[in-house]
């Protein structure tokens, strides 16, 4: 994030800016921050504020599509949020990523996942370390064929291909993300090593027993049921193949009868386009139910203890008001017609979720990185 990058490349600047008073100080602070951030490594590949798009949604349809998104959710017996029509889950996910893909790259980067902040490493380097673990978990070697389930714009797939030599194919339901993935492939010289394909990961366009291994990073949470996507992964894996996934789940500390817990989880669901939230035990059982053998199951958020928590950067964003600045910039651009008139609602939807995301992590009722490793029996 901007603050995280400032803390890495320009220590002390942001803290000193925070002591300034008045509108002039705020303008100078934002300008300096923008100038510093825009010159940092990797920033030229990110969309700029006024370049933000809404995927396959035209500007004039943003308001109507957002209203449909909002109305897609209902509450269960305990007040927990869920998508009312399970047949529209993938349409919802596709709409969500049309809305947020450019915004994610602008505000977060091209790795659409969380990771612990490791000692001595920047935010981006910590993310790549988190991604590269997959190659080790799956025992990948040059020439092996690996599937990235729910690849987004492809950074995890490119990292895994780069550090393992394996041929990685990614699948995402969102066509705009395919365009962004292909752009990043050319930029990084990985055309031919990482191949993005558009498709539904619960009905994949691949033949049986195609891949030697598969992984998913913070993506299968969008499936209507985990069994739906796990069964497809099982089908396309060769016998003996491994499937590793970082799952967004509730932990053993989550209490569905605790109204505060439910409110926090509902915010995470709505602000991330999820159908609901599963528990870690439900995720384990889903893999077993489709025929996998469970090899490993533990919450990576609890280890190693030397790293800063996965919610460290979002916590800084909340603490220093960066979310408020982002919301103001987007609202201003919308008001003068540079972005869709109602586009600020999408920005607010995600930004207003972040404090609850931090609370979910800090209270240990939610984790985005429960590691499951499954094996398809030989």
UniProtKB/Swiss-Prot annotation:
Gene3D superfamilies: Vaccinia Virus protein VP39 (3.40.50.150). Pfam families: Methyltransf_11, Sterol_MT_C. It is a single-pass membrane protein. GO terms for cellular component: endoplasmic reticulum; membrane. The chain crosses the membrane at residues 17-37. GO terms for biological process: methylation; steroid biosynthetic process. It catalyses: squalene + 2 S-adenosyl-L-methionine = 3,22-dimethyl-1,2,23,24-tetradehydro-2,3,22,23-tetrahydrosqualene + 2 S-adenosyl-L-homocysteine + 2 H(+). Its EC number is 2.1.1.262. GO terms for molecular function: S-adenosylmethionine-dependent methyltransferase activity. It comes from the Eukaryota. Keywords: Endoplasmic reticulum, Lipid biosynthesis, Lipid metabolism, Membrane, Methyltransferase, Microsome, S-adenosyl-L-methionine, Transferase, Transmembrane, Transmembrane helix. InterPro entries: Methyltransf_11 (IPR013216), MeTrfase_SMT (IPR030384), SAM-dependent_MTases_sf (IPR029063), Sterol_MeTrfase_C (IPR013705). SUPFAM superfamilies: S-adenosyl-L-methionine-dependent methyltransferases. The keyword Lipid biosynthesis applies. It is found in: Microsome membrane. PROSITE patterns: SAM_MT_ERG6_SMT. PANTHER family: 24-METHYLENESTEROL C-METHYLTRANSFERASE 2 (PTHR44742:SF2), PTHR44742. Converts squalene to mono- and dimethyl derivatives, but not to tri- and tetramethylated products. Unable to methylate cycloartenol, zymosterol or lanosterol. Produces mainly dimethylated squalene. Belongs to the class I-like SAM-binding methyltransferase superfamily. Erg6/SMT family. This is Squalene methyltransferase 1. The lineage of its organism: Eukaryota, Viridiplantae, Chlorophyta, core chlorophytes, Trebouxiophyceae. The gene is TMT-1.
């Amino acid at each position: 994030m901007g603050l995280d990058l400032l803390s890495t490349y320009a220590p002390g600047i942001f803290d000193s800016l925070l002591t300034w008073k008045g509108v002039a100080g705020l303008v100078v602070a934002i300008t300096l921050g923008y100038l510093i951030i825009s010159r940092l490594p990797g920033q030229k590949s990110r969309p700029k504020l006024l370049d933000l798009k809404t995927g396959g949604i035209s500007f004039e349809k943003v308001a109507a599509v957002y209203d449909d998104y909002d109305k897609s959710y209902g509450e269960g017996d305990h007040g927990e949020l869920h998508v009312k029509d399970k047949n529209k889950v993938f349409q919802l996910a596709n709409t969500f990523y049309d809305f947020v893909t450019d915004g994610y790259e602008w505000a977060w980067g091209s790795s659409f996942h969380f990771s612990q902040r490791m000692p001595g490493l920047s935010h981006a380097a910590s993310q790549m370390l988190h991604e590269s673990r997959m190659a080790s978990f799956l025992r990948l070697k040059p020439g092996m064929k690996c599937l990235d389930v729910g690849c987004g714009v492809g950074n995890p797939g490119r990292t895994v291909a780069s550090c393992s030599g394996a041929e990685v194919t990614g699948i995402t339901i969102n066509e705009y993300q395919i365009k962004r993935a292909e752009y990043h492939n050319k930029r990084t010289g990985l055309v031919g090593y990482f191949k993005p394909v558009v498709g539904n990961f619960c009905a994949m366009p691949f033949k049986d027993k195609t891949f030697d291994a598969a992984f998913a990073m913070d993506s299968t949470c969008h499936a209507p049921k985990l069994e739906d996507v796990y069964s497809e992964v099982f089908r396309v894996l060769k016998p003996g193949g491994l499937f590793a996934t970082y799952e967004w789940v509730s932990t053993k500390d989550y209490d569905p009868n605790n109204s505060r817990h439910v409110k926090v989880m509902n915010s995470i669901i709505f602000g991330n386009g999820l159908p609901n939230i599963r528990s870690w035990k439900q995720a384990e059982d889903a893999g077993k139910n489709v025929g996998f053998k469970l090899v490993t199951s533990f919450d990576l958020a609890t280890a190693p203890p030397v790293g800063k928590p996965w919610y460290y950067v979002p916590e800084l964003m909340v603490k220093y008001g960066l979310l408020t600045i982002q919301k103001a910039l987007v609202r201003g651009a919308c008001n003068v017609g540079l972005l869709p008139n109602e586009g600020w609602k999408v920005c607010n939807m995600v930004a207003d979720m972040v404090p609850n995301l931090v609370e979910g992590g800090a209270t240990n009722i939610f984790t985005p990185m429960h590691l499951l490793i499954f094996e398809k029996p030989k």
